Amino acid sequence: MSPSDVPINWKRNLTVAWLGCFLTGAAFSLVMPFLPLYVEQLGVTGHSALNMWSGLVFSITFLFSAIASPFWGGLADRKGRKIMLLRSALGMAIVMLLMGLAQNIWQFLLLRALLGLLGGFVPNANALIATQVPRNKSGWALGTLSTGGVSGALLGPLAGGLLADQYGLRPVFFITASVLLVCFLLTLFFTRERFQPVSKKEMLHVREVVGSLKNPKLVLSLFVTTLIIQVATGSIAPILTLYVRELAGNVSNIAFISGMIASVPGVAALLSAPRLGKLGDRIGPEKILITALIISVLLLIPMSFVQTPWQLGVLRFLLGAADGALLPAVQTLLVYNASNQIAGRIFSYNQSFRDIGNVTGPLMGAAISASYGFRAVFCVTAGVVLFNAIYSWNSLRRRRETLAAK
C-alpha cells in the first residue's frame, strides 16, 4: 500500500492540533499579566499615556489578525492547512523573540501588529480537523479542540506572572518563543495531511465561495454569533476586578479573588465543551447553540444584582459551562454548511469576526461602565446576547423551512 493510500489518522492529528492550540494559547497569554509593565519599561510614563499605549499594543494584534485571516484562509485552501500551521507557529516564534529585544514602544507596537498578521494557528487547526473528522463526530472533535486553547489561556497568565517574577520581563518573551518553536516541531513531525494543491486560477472567488455555501445567510449569522460571543466575554473583562473589589470591600486578597473569578468560566468550559459537543452530535448543534445562548442571557442578568464575590463566581462558572458549547456549535454548523474546498476561508472569516469581537467587547464594557456603572454592563451584555439568540433562532428556522420545502 502506497503512503497516499494509508488512511489519515485524524485522532492523532486531533491530539497534535490540541497540543498546538494549547501551546499557542499559553504563549499568547504568557505575556498578558505584565504587558503594561513592559510598556512602562520601554519608556512610556504617565497614567494616561500608559493606559493608551497598553490598550494599543493589546488591541492592534486582534485588528491585524482580523485583516490577515481571510488571506491566510485562502492560502490554506490553495496550499494546505498543515503548511499554514507551520507558517503561523514559526512566524509567531520569531516575532516573540524580537519582542524580547525591542528597545522602544514603537518597535513593540509594530511587532504586536506583526504578531496579528502572522497568527492564525487556531482557525487553521479547526479547518484541518473539520475536514478530516467524520461528520458525526464533528461536534465532539471541535469541542475537544477548543479546550486546548482555553487550557493554554488559563495556565499562561499564571506561568507568565511566575516567570516574570523569577527571571524578569524580557526572558519571558524568549521562553514564549521557545514554546512556539516546540509547537512548530510537533506539527512538522506528527501532523499528517493529504492535500492536492490548487492553482490560483482554479480557486473560487469570494462571490463563488458565497454561492457554494448551502445557506449563506445562516453562515453570516454564525459569523455574527462568533462576534457577539467575544463581545459578551470581552465586555466584562475591563470591569471585573473593579466590580469584585466593589463587592468584596476592604480585603487583603482582592487580586487572588479576582483571579479566581476571572478563571472559573474557562475551567467550566474545559469540562463542558467536549461533552456538549458530543451531545450536539446526537441532538444537533442547532439546539445546543440556541439553548446555550438563552442560558447565557439568564445567567448574565442576575450578575448585575449579586451582593458577594462568591455569588458572582458561581454564576460565572455556570456561564462558562454554557459558553463552552457556543463556539464548537458554531464551528460544527460551519462544517455542515461549507465544503472542504473552502473550509480554510470560512474558518478564517469566522476568526476575523472573533478578532473584531475581541476588540469591540472591552471598548463597549469600558464605555458602559464609565457612563452607567459596573452593573449596567451585565444587563446590556445580556441584551446583546438575547438579540443574537433571536437572530440565530430565526436563521436556523429559515434553514429548516428551506430544507422542508425541498
From Swiss-Prot:
PROSITE patterns: MFS. It is found in: Cell inner membrane. Gene3D superfamilies: MFS general substrate transporter like domains. It is a multi-pass membrane protein. GO terms for molecular function: transmembrane transporter activity. InterPro entries: MFS, MFS_dom, MFS_MdtG_subfamily, MFS_trans_sf, Mutidrug-R_MdtG, Tet-R_TetA/multi-R_MdtG-like. GO terms for cellular component: plasma membrane. Keywords: Cell inner membrane, Cell membrane, Membrane, Transmembrane, Transmembrane helix, Transport. It comes from the Bacteria. The chain crosses the membrane at residues 16-36, 56-76, 90-110, 113-133, 144-164, 171-191, 222-242, 254-274, 288-308, 317-337, 376-396. It holds the Pfam family MFS_1. Belongs to the major facilitator superfamily. DHA1 family. MdtG (TC 2.A.1.2.20) subfamily. NCBIfam families: PRK09874.1 (NF007372). PANTHER family: MULTIDRUG RESISTANCE PROTEIN MDTG. This is Multidrug resistance protein MdtG. It comes from Citrobacter koseri (strain ATCC BAA-895 / CDC 4225-83 / SGSC4696).
